[in-house]
Amino acid sequence: NLIACPGYPEAVQNMVDFNTEIGNTAFVVGDTPFRLEPTGTALSNWGNNTAMATDNNETGVVTYDDYLAFYYPSGLTNDNKGNTIVVPPSHMMLNTIVNSDAVSYEWFAPAGLNRGGIINATSAGYVDMNGVFQSTAVPQSLRDVLAGVKINPISTLQGSGLVCMGQYSRAKVASALDRINVVRLVAYLRRQLNILAKPYLFEPNDAQTRKEIKGAVDSVLLELVGQRALNDFIVVCDTTNNTPARIDRSELHVDIAIEPVKAVEFIYIPLRILNTGAIASGNYGSLAA
């Protein structure tokens, strides 16, 4: 369910096209260039394609897609012979996403201290103009710039090491699909529903079949509610969406609407100082901001 071509940002559009061909049932992990410098200007220019590149390359990125995400920066690790090598962001994130899925589900964000830790690289950084790897911690100021262009930062956090601190997809417009956990949930659902629907091919196109397939879909979605993927859902498979004309064309329609669970990305904890006795007396007003 993951697609990547580590080290080749120019292959991103090809991967997106392939995912489109297979019905957007996977998630594309894209790379930023090795030589992309950790400055606000450089990152903003690349993410916004200020140079007006016509293809994805070192000067800019042109591809937008809900099922695509970019990460920054690259990493430093050792190969099988013990040599120190530079690896692209996807090298780190493929491992991180797989590890996240192993302890949770695809609809849990592969980011943050619980599931976003990078364990297959020793530092993060970029390759300078002399071909030398330079480490960078990707501080909050750069993380804010990266968020503005929907690129997910791999930061060095004190006491925690390398951690992915973002889960933006490369969606062109703001929607639930501009977050990776929701995108991967939808891709997962598409795969499961494709499998679920196949046994109903060539069954009688009648009320019983409609009832059976609706029950099967309800069961899958109800399980996802229990697994913290969905807040709610609705499934319609009756004569309202299976009209006589559709039945005469040998079609069976199942319409589904879902409310995906969103991830916490910002935490606000304001601290108020009160006079002695204010809490005991109840004279502290509302604590809600």
Model-derived features: positions:
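Structured, hydrophobic secondary-structure cores that serve as assembly/anchoring elements
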Residues: 1-289
